[in-house]
């Protein structure tokens, strides 16, 4: 399983732990397979962030989580295992066209706006979002939009 704790993040993103400026602690396999990309219904007014920066300052088993969205296609996150040392992964935030979740059990985030779990669950970025991912049994609880708030996730992958 993957246990993630993060500060900030795409709330409502089922099972992949903290997002944005945050930290993901892995008690899980070194690599997690990304779900297959499938079509999803169109949802307007949901600008996506291309790459979510992850900053890790944690003990040995640390996974950094990145999420990439282009246009209306949402790619599942890549999870990479890193060594026990302060690690900083900084990528520029790129404004994208309105985008929606396109992978099973993947959430849609709009910074401080809407957060929608494509598997099961619905939330609001500035409030509380709770989602259950159908593709990989996972529970995600998050508060806040991109860059502030708290998100917590647990999943079996």
From Swiss-Prot:
Presence of keyword Ribonucleoprotein: no
Residue ranges crossing the lipid bilayer per the database entry: none
Keyword set, alphabetical order: Cuticle, Repeat
Sequence repeat start-end pairs: 27-30, 33-37, 39-42, 84-87, 90-93, 96-99, 102-105, 135-138
One MF annotation (Gene Ontology) recorded for this entry: structural constituent of cuticle
Domain comment, as recorded: The tetrapeptide (A-A-P-[AV]) repeats found throughout the protein are also present in many proteins constituting the protective envelope of other species.
Job of this protein: Component of the cuticle of migratory locust which contains more than 100 different structural proteins.
The protein's name: Cuticle protein 63
Species of the source: Locusta migratoria (Migratory locust)
């Amino acid at each position: 399983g993957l246990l993630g704790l993060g500060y900030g993040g795409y709330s409502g993103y089922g099972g992949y732990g903290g997002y944005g400026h945050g930290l993901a602690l892995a008690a899980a396999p070194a690599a997690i397979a990304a779900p297959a990309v499938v079509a999803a219904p169109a949802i307007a007014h949901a600008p996506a962030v291309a790459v979510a920066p992850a900053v890790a300052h944690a003990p040995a088993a640390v996974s950094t989580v990145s999420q990439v969205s282009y246009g209306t296609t949402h790619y599942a996150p890549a999870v990479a295992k890193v060594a026990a040392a302060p690690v900083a992964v900084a990528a520029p935030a790129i404004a994208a066209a309105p985008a929606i979740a396109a992978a099973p059990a993947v959430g849609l985030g709009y910074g401080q706006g809407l957060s929608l779990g494509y598997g099961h669950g619905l939330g609001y970025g500035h409030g509380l979002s709770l989602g259950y991912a159908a593709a990989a049994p996972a529970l995600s609880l998050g508060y806040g939009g991109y860059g502030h708030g708290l998100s917590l996730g647990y999943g079996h992958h």
